[in-house]
């Protein structure tokens, strides 16, 4: 019979009044955001069903020989593929449902894009953890039922976090807690039989894994997604609100970048390095857009130096969105990112580019170099506005020559109108963007304002004397940057601290069952000394002392004395406890460290219903192939939702299943993985 230990007095995990910390939003609350998440969960289930049906039809098509059966299967397969395409479009519609996440204040501003939270299935830790506690730690598992329940409640709360800092802390606390759990219950030499399932945020396809890699990466993704939702709900009509938005998007970029650099073999395409790089760019672009809105919020004065600054700020935002759109257009991101997101990036790139040209035209047409003006400063600002001046023009000559200024200004207006028309065209082409009325209103208002300015200064020979205005150089007074996550601000106590100090009592170390040492505590000399922090070890053991004769060994860890848990007691505390039993016989329970079986770290099998290979499997196969043969041809990675059939398609399972221990399969091929009012002649543009 395995000896068991009495638990130490449980320490409070949190201070009183912090009960909210483990709670998420009410999952039954019918808010706009919860409705969207419920729709996402329902779509995920429909996609799972459709993918399984497609997989079954493809398998039947491979083995069927009857021509009529094959024709019928092909017909059914075409219906299933059509359904999958429709479901994908519905999921894309949820990803572009930006109105729900915006602030409640009425604002004439372009909506920002948030990320939706990844959905997951429930996981029951109780049986697996209780078995492991009994087997590995030799303790009564029923003593930890409340702790396991707390962990499961925390995970459940993380599925519906509140859209504020408390929600972020909730997710961070679970992420930190997962680090404790991984060390306590997940040995590096075997799997625990728990299957963690998360749904891809963009495709809805479920991916399952038996290690905590997927769980931790998905929680990090949701922390970043929650920051984006916090950023989009900020009041962008106040300086404080815009500052909060900038901070939130920078933090979102930091979390996503941390995810990309820390979890390189994530098994889902929405968390692949290529996709995460694009998402980081998108968050920084939206942060830069908020910086521009913050500059414009007090009103743009019709003054030379102010207009130079605003024009370059707008050009900076346009540059950020151009780079974002270029990244979204690359493979393999292009296959899985919502098309409407790429359209938004394209629209904003041209919209803010048009604003840069409009403000440049305004400063050239409306302002003259007056006597007594700071000529040198204006010349310097104008020269810094462009990479190069148009042929035959110099900054100082242009400032002094009214005709040249107006001519160059008209060139900027001409380019601004072209950019406005291109942004409106793209917004009208995308069905999802046509439904966002505020976006169309902002684009139309900016276009009309530029056209009015052009009409006020139009002449008959404009087409003959038109100058091709150069691009406005991007420049900003505040360069947005990644804000890395600070997990130290969240204080978390290990749910399973009763098992003992984590540095000693972990899943990576094997222990003997607790042995009872019955000996008499002699006055003065115990026959051994103690060393270490917590728990303490037996040291310098006299082979003739009563403890040694009772079975104690040098190096043993003392875990209890007379039923008192000693795993967290220091040397002085244990010594004081022993001496309190002077002259009496005591029972001291000890454990010995066993040699760990040498074994390579198991690579975790990843399961994705109906998928050829997940991202992590591709990366793992690459690692293996590099060792075997570095000259193998790299084949193109297939899309996560490739609707058609392929001759070289690998066989896929229609159901999720647990892997067999020790089963290894060789890989034969290597895969790579603002409001704008019309400009008057007054000193203010707004």
From Swiss-Prot:
Residues 111-502 form the BRO1 domain. Keywords: Coiled coil, Cytoplasm, Phosphoprotein. Pfam families: BRO1, HR1, PDZ. The keyword Endoplasmic reticulum does not apply. It comes from the Eukaryota. The modification Phosphothreonine is found at residue 655. Residues 46-66 are annotated as: Interaction with Rho. Its main location: cytoplasm. Residues 515-593 form the PDZ domain. GO terms for biological process: glomerular filtration; negative regulation of stress fiber assembly; signal transduction. One of its GO terms (cellular component) is plasma membrane. It is found in: Cytoplasm, Perinuclear region. Residues 26-100 form the REM-1 domain. Interacts with GTP-bound RhoA and RhoB. Interacts with both GTP- and GDP-bound RhoA. Interacts with KRT18. Belongs to the RHPN family. Binds specifically to GTP-Rho. May function in a Rho pathway to limit stress fiber formation and/or increase the turnover of F-actin structures in the absence of high levels of RhoA activity. PANTHER family: RHOPHILIN (PTHR23031), RHOPHILIN-2-RELATED (PTHR23031:SF5). This is Rhophilin-2. It comes from Mus musculus. The lineage of its organism: Eukaryota, Metazoa, Chordata, Craniata, Vertebrata.
